[in-house]
Amino acid sequence: MGRRRAPELYRAPFPLYALQVDPSTGLLIAAGGGGAAKTGIKNGVHFLQLELINGRLSASLLHSHDTETRATMNLALAGDILAAGQDAHCQLLRFQAHQQQGNKAEKAGSKEQGPRQRKGAAPAEKKCGAETQHEGLELRVENLQAVQTDFSSDPLQKVVCFNHDNTLLATGGTDGYVRVWKVPSLEKVLEFKAHEGEIEDLALGPDGKLVTVGRDLKASVWQKDQLVTQLHWQENGPTFSSTPYRYQACRFGQVPDQPAGLRLFTVQIPHKRLRQPPPCYLTAWDGSNFLPLRTKSCGHEVVSCLDVSESGTFLGLGTVTGSVAIYIAFSLQCLYYVREAHGIVVTDVAFLPEKGRGPELLGSHETALFSVAVDSRCQLHLLPSRRSVPVWLLLLLCVGLIIVTILLLQSAFPGFL
């Protein structure tokens, strides 16, 4: 796991904070911006077309959606609907991509210069309902409903996610409240205080249970607004000093080859920065009783974000120092690591989906992880397919070993057989 470089897939004209991949179209969606400050740095959501060209995965800018003075800090995807966390609000976007016959001129006076962003040329920003057409692919993005989701003195929505059937979305922010909203009307259906202080992350399970982690060092499991249990990762964890830890991220994941199986994965980081930083930890939990199954150290770099692959096979991690790693979910062993890939905090990571266009784009690799950071770059991390020995070859080797053993015994002891 030495030093290596990850290929740069795309560079945006603004800091990137959030990332999603649409499995049906293969669109990579990256969002961010410079915020409301008048620094000249724009805010937007970029839709990138992924293509496999000569065995290499590439990304080209297909559409740039202007978010005016609001930088998108977090994203969730449900079919053709995006939920974007922008300051204290959640903005729903709908995007539609389909093939067109022939190339048509771009509508709405677009100044887009083609699907690939040319060096030195700023991408055009698209207003509500704008369309872009390139090489037969049309993309239309429109703003839907928006609602304020956080009401603290310094309000900020920090996380958003959809439920399993995409009919509800949950938000959390700096005021410590979880709020659940209908999709797409954004009518509020539930509100409750989950943490004292900021909510760092939340995850909705297929059975409706909600897991929240906060800066108050707690991780809680909820059924609607009723507390089911609190997580205690140290019950099955390592023995260490009295250094306080807090939960940084949580994600549900499937159990490979077990359709009914469910796992919860959490990341624990030191609550305070120390001169000699203690390690961070990954924990796998039983998704039904929320007991810890396995805990492993994931290094001394503070983890900033977590993602789980679609099949639940792999975990992707980003750190505040810019490193990116891929772990296998079963044993929590590290399979891939790039130190300081970005050189600055990794703000989000996302796996290439394993359905839809995913297998076509993956090529001969086992999985692909995308990472974005404040350095405005989107990087690609590929895990080569692990070589395995065919069963027939193992059987042949066993038979050969038996024959050689018999011949050796026969030569050493002529009357043995």
UniProtKB/Swiss-Prot annotation:
The keyword ATP-binding does not apply. Residues 104-115 have a biased composition (Basic and acidic residues). It comes from the Eukaryota. Ubiquitous. WD repeats lie at residues 4-50, 58-97, 127-183, 187-224, 230-287, 291-329, 334-385. Residues 1-388 are cytoplasmic. InterPro entries: Quinoprotein_ADH-like_sf (IPR011047), Sec12-like (IPR045260), WD40/YVTN_repeat-like_dom_sf (IPR015943), WD40_rpt (IPR001680). It holds the Pfam family WD40. The keyword Hydrolase does not apply. PROSITE patterns: WD_REPEATS_2, WD_REPEATS_REGION. Interacts with SAR1B (GDP-bound form). Interacts with MIA2; recruits PREB to endoplasmic reticulum exit sites. Interacts with CIDEB; facilitating loading of SCAP-SREBP into COPII vesicles. PANTHER family: PROLACTIN REGULATORY ELEMENT BINDING PROTEIN, PROLACTIN REGULATORY ELEMENT-BINDING PROTEIN. This is Guanine nucleotide-exchange factor SEC12.
